[in-house]
Amino acid sequence: MTNSTSDFDGTGKVSGASSEQGLNGYARTPLYDMHLQLGAKMVPFAGYEMPVQYGLGVMGEHLHTREKAGLFDVSHMGQAQLFPEDPDSDVAPVFEALVPGGIISLKERGIRYTQLTNQDGGILDDLMVTRFGNTLWLVVNAACKNDDFAHIAQSLVGKARLSVENRALLSLQGPLAEAVLKEHLPAAAD
């Protein structure tokens, strides 16, 4: 399992962070080997080899998630931390200039779904933002991640530093997701 971090240079390229590459040229998430061991059918998606289904099949898994809960590997999505250039300041006011969602008011470990905007206020992409102290954790869509990170880095030069993460990311979805989380990770369910 890989877990790496790198600074984004603002040119549209990430230096230092990488995903394992398969023989077919598609990237692999840190959970790739586990998916194979569990019998997943892998398909190309957003430049990655991703699991499309397991034994229940697409419809069975869909219904199970809608009725109960399903766990998804979303490690292909763009993940980054945003740090203030001045470690004694808060990065939220700087980042809030790029999104319509209230980031300054975000509570510790609070999450906000919002949109990344261009200089004219047009929407470039949607993203999730989580506050950790004076830093922010960002999750953006896989297909747009390099463009999103370039826009953020270029817009915040001298104000913030973007550090791209390459690690596993899971999404637990469905009406029983909270109960499943409480059963297996009680502290995380709060």
Task: List the predicted regions and their residue ranges.
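Basic, glycine/lysine-rich polyanion-binding surfaces/domains
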Residues: 2-190
